[in-house]
């Protein structure tokens, strides 16, 4: 009887390690497009700070609007490509992790919100409100931790629980930061200005 239990435990541990490995490989793929949008937001902070120092809020609004536009312009095609080609991409890059296509597809939602959060956080940093993203991330992190415990332990959800909790964390972060950014400046995001 003890041998059967030990064998079952070993099988569960092996499955957990496999799923954890797949998730880590998906996270690596997801972070490639985010590196590009992250660079935009690094440049956004001094650009916004300089406009704020001369009280040129119209320029601040234009720069934030353009940053949202550029992030969406970069991240949405990447997300669409990852959704459409999730399985072939994983088979090509990580053949042992090709069963994680559904994890990659769901993770694209997280990728979109992380990209938008870079812009919102860059705006808040430009206004000198560096504590707001930190507090929002702490709140999102607590929610993520609780959701991880509940969802990952559910055998029907399993490792997808980690992805779902990451989405929840990023959505919470976006809502809180966007609320406080709108308190600093009434955002007028108009993508038409950047297209034509």
Regions inferred by a protein language model and the residue ranges of each:
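Helix-loop interface residues and adjacent transmembrane-helix termini in multi-pass membrane transporters
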Residues: 97, 126-127, 153-156
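C-terminal transmembrane helix end/exit motif
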Residues: 1, 167-196
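Membrane-interface junctions at transmembrane-helix termini in multi-pass inner-membrane proteins
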Residues: 109-139
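Alpha-helical transmembrane segments of polytopic membrane transporters and translocases
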Residues: 11-37, 69-70
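Interfacial transmembrane-helix starts/ends
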Residues: 24, 44, 56-73, 77-85, ...
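Helix-loop junctions and terminal segments of transmembrane helices
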Residues: 34-54
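Interfacial segments at transmembrane-helix termini and the short loops linking adjacent helices
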Residues: 14-17, 65, 83-112
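Membrane-interface helix-loop junctions in multi-pass transport and translocation proteins
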Residues: 131, 141-174, 189
